[in-house]
Every structure is written in structure tokens, then in C-alpha cells.
């Protein structure tokens, strides 16, 4: 089974068309299809033929209600704060989705405090094997370094991953680090960006 995870399209329809042409069993949009909610319907028309193969998270540019309505209109799966099973070659896996970002200086519509992030992750403690898709990166990795020595990730997410060691973490949000990977213990971490990351399970 092939899973294509991508993020931060921000209304770039050409990039989204490239994603839609790729072959996958599941397509996970890890937030920020739009710019402040504008252009979601244009994205929906491109992805509509894929139907329930498309799982969607809100980024910090979208609200949960916008993404829920968007998924209802186009027949997609609202993946925000959901746990969904997928069968891999080696057995069952669990996929968890968490949208929004940690707090930013920009007061965007979809932001969580560290306390809210902790509350959202608590229900995932101990689930194995877990594949975690979030919009925002963990702190102090190659994925959240937006300028040399400057990091914008979530300390709460970092601590949770260190403690729980999911098999994979996929994120976006920091455009400057799209395509980079890192490890936290045994957890493989990827900033998927708008070009996406294809995982075979």
C-alpha cells in the first residue's frame, strides 16, 4: 500500500495537480491547502476524483469547521484528531492526524497552545505501530529550523515523540525545510512539503 503525504499547497494548483496525478492508495493533505481558507474549492475540484482516498487536516491557515465542510462537499475524509487503521504488508498499522500549528507570531486561524497539543496527543499514548501526521514539526530538529539556529517547532510534540516513539512522524508548516528528514530516537521524521512524500507500507 502506498501513502502519499503532502502539505502547504497554499493554493498552488499546479503543485496539487502533480500530486493528484501520482499513484497512491491514500493521499493525506497535512494542512494549508489554502491561504486563510481561500481557494479550498479549487483544490477540492482537483482532488474530487480521488474521493475517500483523500484524508485532510487543517493547517494554521484553515479552521476545523472549514475543513470539515470541505470534506463533506467533496467526499474526502476529515482526518483531524482521528485515528484510522491501514493494513500494511507486515500487518495492521494505526494512523493519527492532528492539524493546526503551535502558536505563531501571526495570529493565524488554526493554532494550538502547547497545553492543547498535549491534550490532543494524550489519547495516542502507547499505540503501536503508530504513524503520526501533524501539520507542525517538533522542536529542535532539521524540520523546524526556519533560519540558521532558529527553531519554531513544538516542545510538547518533541517530548511526546521522544517518550512514545511512533514509527513515523510526517509534518509540514515550515516551508524552508520542506523535503528534510530527521530522527528522534527510533522515530523517522519528515517535512513532506508540497512535493509530498510517498511511503510504501
What are these regions (language model features)?
Residues 10-15, 34-38, 60-67, 102-106, ...:
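Active-site environment of divalent metal-dependent phosphoester hydrolases
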Residues 15, 69, 83-91, 108, ...:
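Binuclear metal-dependent phosphoesterase catalytic core
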Residues 11, 62-156:
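Conserved catalytic scaffold of divalent metal-dependent phosphoesterases
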Residues 1-4:
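Extreme N-terminal starter segment of soluble prokaryotic enzymes
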Residues 8, 27, 32, 59, ...:
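Divalent metal-coordination and catalytic microenvironments
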Residues 6-88, 192-196:
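Core catalytic region of metal-dependent phosphoesterases/phosphodiesterases
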Amino acid at each position: 500500500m502506498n501513502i502519499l503525504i503532502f502539505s502547504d499547497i497554499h493554493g498552488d494548483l499546479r503543485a496539487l495537480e502533480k500530486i493528484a496525478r501520482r499513484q497512491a492508495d491514500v493521499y493525506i493533505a497535512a494542512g494549508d491547502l489554502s491561504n486563510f481558507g481561500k481557494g479550498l474549492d479549487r483544490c477540492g475540484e482537483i482532488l474530487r476524483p480521488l474521493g475517500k482516498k483523500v484524508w485532510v487536516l487543517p493547517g494554521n491557515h484553515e479552521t476545523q469547521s472549514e475543513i470539515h465542510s470541505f470534506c463533506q462537499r467533496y467526499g474526502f475524509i476529515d482526518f483531524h484528531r482521528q485515528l484510522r487503521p491501514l493494513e500494511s504488508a507486515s500487518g495492521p498499522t494505526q494512523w493519527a492526524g492532528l492539524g493546526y500549528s503551535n502558536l505563531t507570531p501571526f495570529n493565524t486561524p488554526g493554532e494550538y497552545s502547547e497545553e492543547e497539543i498535549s491534550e490532543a496527543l494524550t489519547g495516542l499514548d502507547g499505540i503501536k505501530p503508530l504513524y503520526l501526521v501533524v501539520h507542525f514539526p517538533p522542536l529542535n530538529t532539521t524540520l523546524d529550523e526556519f533560519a540558521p539556529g532558529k527553531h519554531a517547532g513544538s516542545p510538547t510534540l518533541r517530548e511526546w515523540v521522544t517518550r512514545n516513539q511512533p514509527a513515523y512522524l510526517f509534518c509540514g508548516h515550515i516551508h524552508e525545510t520542506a523535503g528534510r528528514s530527521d530522527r528522534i530516537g527510533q522515530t523517522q521524521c519528515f517535512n513532506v512539503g508540497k512535493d509530498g512524500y510517498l511511503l510504501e507500507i
